[in-house]
């Protein structure tokens, strides 16, 4: 449900993220056993079958899905800082997508003021999948028991 459809406005903006999938092999990505974070460059590396996904960046450029080659190269260059053997294999896929970001950096989770029966969970930014289990538990607790989650995450904090 778009916030304008229910007569309220949640202060958020899109944050564009990118990923580039590099095949595993002598001229490609290393064979990683587990996912890792390249903290210095904020790039996440996830082994997925026959390739490693290099993901990250946050670009505030409105609601557009134009892929910027420099952002994609940044992912590979970050990988090379930590994996010097990362070759020049062509990526098997490249992607960008928009993540909902709240204006204060915290997720927006809880009942929407003025709209009975509507609970929202948005604004997680780069941590959407990471925070999905705990967010789901919070929503389930709120709906089933009426116990509200932290005020810091409530949509009412913007009123």
Predicted regions: what is each one?
Residues 1-116:
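Active-site substrate-recognition segment that forms the wall
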